[in-house]
Amino acid sequence: MYGPFLLKEFLNDVPLKPMHNTRMMAEAKFDFEEKKTQKSAATIENHSNRSCRDWLADMGMVFSKSQLCTKFDNRFRDAKAAQTIVCFQHSVLCRFAPYMRYIEKKLNEVLPATFYIHSGKGLEELNKWVIESKFEGVCTESDYEAFDASQDQYIVAFELALMRYLGLPNDLIEDYKYIKTHLGSKLGNFAIMRFSGEASTFLFNTMANMLFTFLRYKLKGDERICFAGDDMCANRALFIKDTHEGFLKKLKLKAKVDRTNRPSFCGWSLSSDGIYKKPQLVFERLCIAKETANLANCIDNYAIEVSYAYKLGERIKERMSEEELEAFYNCVRVIIKHKHLLKSEIRSVYEEV
């Protein structure tokens, strides 16, 4: 009941083609196999226990992410709740991953130019799209509360309807439904939600985000909106509609709407001049890299992030506050002082007079 309704609403804005595309399916399988076999022998060996035949398909192993948290909003906090990852048996990932790539190809095939999905794309593509989209004045961002935990039975109904519409094998759809409704671990059974580690995590999160946007806002068709997982930013103020208010109240997914004249997306600030990274964050990461004697391994990545603001020249002064400019100048000083460590072509940007 809910699946076909949600699919219909999605197709109104993104008219997916239901016909099976043999070439796309072959490409999806090849891309998946190539990515898996490109991993180092050490990585494959470390993950060999995930190929154990005694590991049940509907059982996951729960791990806690141990990486440094570098989000801007989490600076100077004493502690933050750990993010969990659920690992699946290799056969489960190999079963679903090629078809998820196929769905992504079908989505990109018909995606209107007014929408942008930041998946498999470089920063130059994002920068070009943002400049074309003219992010000026009041823009709209959606910040979701507990996004992964809110991917409940209604979203699964949409995913199943989508897979049937695209003609995916029925046994695959039944397998997906079984795992979503029966998944457990040593801790016990899980509620229906999204888990980091699923083959479909980013794709289906992005599509759920798009679906919520289509249901929640009055769209005229000329808005430019970018999506990536639970991130969304539109180049104008979007107004809420109440057409589907009854259904939206059923969803666990709740959005905190922010209308701002300083829009951001995936950690990048957006403007009509292009994208640039919040400099305080980059400077603090550079300081951490210096403290941990890891600067040589990551300075190229930070230099690339800073380069988008650096290439704007004097125009960046109109975009940044005094605090941001100070952090930006500090970033540039650190990079130029250590530019002998740069190994990529980005070095030439900082050597130009």
Swiss-Prot record:
Keywords, sorted A to Z: ATP-binding, Helicase, Hydrolase, Multifunctional enzyme, Nucleotide-binding, Nucleotidyltransferase, RNA-directed RNA polymerase, Transferase, Viral RNA replication
Domain spans labelled RdRp catalytic: 137-244
UniProt xrefs under PROSITE patterns: RDRP_SSRNA_POS
Entry's Gene Ontology BP terms: DNA-templated transcription; viral RNA genome replication
Its EC number(s): 2.7.7.48, 3.6.4.13
Pfam families: RdRP_2 (PF00978)
SUPFAM superfamilies: DNA/RNA polymerases
GO molecular function: ATP binding; ATP hydrolysis activity; RNA binding; RNA helicase activity; RNA-directed RNA polymerase activity
InterPro entries: DNA/RNA_pol_sf (IPR043502), RNA-dep_RNA_pol_alsuvir (IPR001788), RNA-dir_pol_PSvirus (IPR007094)
Similarity comment: family membership: Belongs to the potexviruses/carlaviruses RNA replication protein family.
Physiological role: RNA replication. The central part of this protein possibly functions as an ATP-binding helicase.
Protein name per Swiss-Prot or TrEMBL: RNA replication protein
Lineage: Viruses, Riboviria, Orthornavirae, Kitrinoviricota, Alsuviricetes
